[in-house]
Amino acid sequence: MKFIKALPLLMVAGLSLVGCNKAGDVENIKKTGFLNVGITMYEPMDYFDTDGETVIGFDAELANAFAKTLDAEARFIVIKWDSKVLELNSGKIDVIWNGMTITDELKKNIDLTIPYATNYQCVVTKTANIADYTSADSIKDKKVAVESGSAGEAAAEGVTNLNKVTSQEAALLEVKAGTSDCAIIDVTMANSVVGKGDFTGLSTVSADLIAFEKEDFGVGARKGSDLTDKLNVFFKDSYKSGLLTSLSTKYNVAINDATLK
């Protein structure tokens, strides 16, 4: 499968129709031939292949497949996660498609699709220190790295010493470097990268010891956008066709069977 390379946000700003008719997003995408997809580097959802430029992953494959239904091509744009709603509503991107947790706060500002995947937060620390984490109280006095604006930051409520960084990957690197004691990140990402490559020497604390609530992932579109209904139909069709199940197995991502049937 062909994947388009990611573009910096500023390169795309001049190509986007800022302030376009939200109800006509589908028509605009068909005219331009591009679906602008806001992402961060988040393995296994959206991340660079070995060439350092081509975006692959669970969400990337879905975005490519959805774009084809609009006779368009997915164009992946790396954004700052804590600015995702601003980037969407400014028209610089058409959708946020990056393992995004559905929250009541997001619902106030953007439209969200049906839940297509599930997730929960987890604690990651150095393997040598994992015995220090036996309950939720274990992290209260720790220096905890979180991605700014993420579900991990929300889950860290009550922690007094937060180290807010630009991505979940950066949060893990803070732990690896010893500048934070632990990180709170998506288990979806932890299952894919912890203990491997740059994150060798890190381990995930068992959910039996420190548990967080289940979350649902959805794709974000502008309020009133006609993309939302199209995306919901796409997710249900992809479930029926077996595409979602196949990608779930390939990338070890839990899909939301209950809402997709």
What positions do the PLM features span?
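C-terminal motif of bacterial Sec signal peptides marking the signal peptidase cleavage site
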Residues: 16-19
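Ligand-binding clefts/hinges and TM-proximal coupling segments of bilobed small-molecule sensing domains
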Residues: 22-24, 151-166, 203-208, 233-261
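Extracytoplasmic small-molecule ligand-binding "clamshell" domains
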Residues: 27-99
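Short helix-initiation/N-cap motifs at beta->coil->alpha
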Residues: 60, 76-87, 131, 148, ...
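A ligand-binding cleft/hinge motif common to bilobed small-molecule-binding domains
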Residues: 100-108, 155, 181-213
